[in-house]
Amino acid sequence: MKNAKRIIALLLSITAIFSLCACGGATTPSTSDTTAAAEATEPTKDPNAPLCDGKTLKILAITSSFGLNTTQLLYDVAMAEGATEVIVGRLYISGCTLEMHVGNAKNNANAYRYTKISSADGQWKTIENVSLAQGLNDEAWDIIFTQQGAAQAGQPNTYGNYVTELMTYIKETKKTPTVGYVWNMLWAYQQDTDQTVYHTVFGGDQMYMYQENLRAAKEKIVPLNMFDRLIPSGTAVQNARTSYFGDTLTKDTYHLNNLGRVIAGYTLWSILTGKEITEVNIGPVSSYDLPIAVELTDEDRLVVMESVNNAIKNPWEVTPSAYPAK
């Protein structure tokens, strides 16, 4: 009888404890508890699984104009290759660096131009003066894309702790789970550019700038283990420069033209889907700043395919084209 009373008393005590927690009487969770809860919203990842199934793509780029170039034709590529639901968003500031992104995050600054295109209507829309938090939570983004500024990408001393700070902010601020995070490895400027940093930092040497971009990624991005994929945009572009395309893939000696954007777009698509490019089905391409459509010949498509596939296989070095200058 005494044992029965003790058991009943114990059960009543446990019930009281659970009631207290449910009514808010529990202590405030620690920071580690909060972090663990936030991380729990992220799905368990298979490192070998594709980030995109080829049908649905929802990607947000936090970027500069070079990220705009990389993603400008991604929508067109995805739709041409059979996707049915596509949303591409970009939070963009011209020349934006990692340091600037972190400052904007800390100040919740309405500093970005936000552009977005959706398969719902296939039209780019632009909103000015948007914050990182607003863009991150505008859609249930599956993939977050970011990079260093173009002039700083090949300068490891500009990275600081900004990558970690930015990624921490993104994960704490975004309210929906993310399938993957991707880092864009940028291309070198055209050999004859007059951009000051190209000459003062990289000695006016395209291959040196390309190699320094890769070195910075190896030293400052790979060891962090914060990104599910690295996008070898720079290697794909450099591969294509060894073909009969030559050093003609920019519109102004540093921003990509429409042909360069096709190469970058297919590189990103291949990385996200995990698929080798076996066809280049995109039609005539144009952009908001380059409205004259470019029609790819059959041989052009082979060069695009070759440049991308070789970059995926060998992202850290240039693979000479089988279609050299004629």
Regions found by a protein language model. Name each.
Residues 69-159:
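Conserved SGNH/GDSL esterase-like catalytic core that processes O-acyl groups on lipids
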Residues 129-254, 258:
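Alpha-helical cap/lid subdomain in secreted, periplasmic
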Residues 18-39:
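Sec-dependent signal peptide cleavage junction
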Residues 1-11:
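Bacterial N-terminal signal peptides that target proteins for export
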Residues 11-19:
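Bacterial N-terminal signal peptides
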Residues 42-82, 304, 314-316, 320-325:
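N-terminal module-boundary/linker segments of secreted carbohydrate-active enzymes
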Residues 255, 259, 265-326:
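Conserved catalytic region of serine esterases and O-acyltransferases that act on ester linkages
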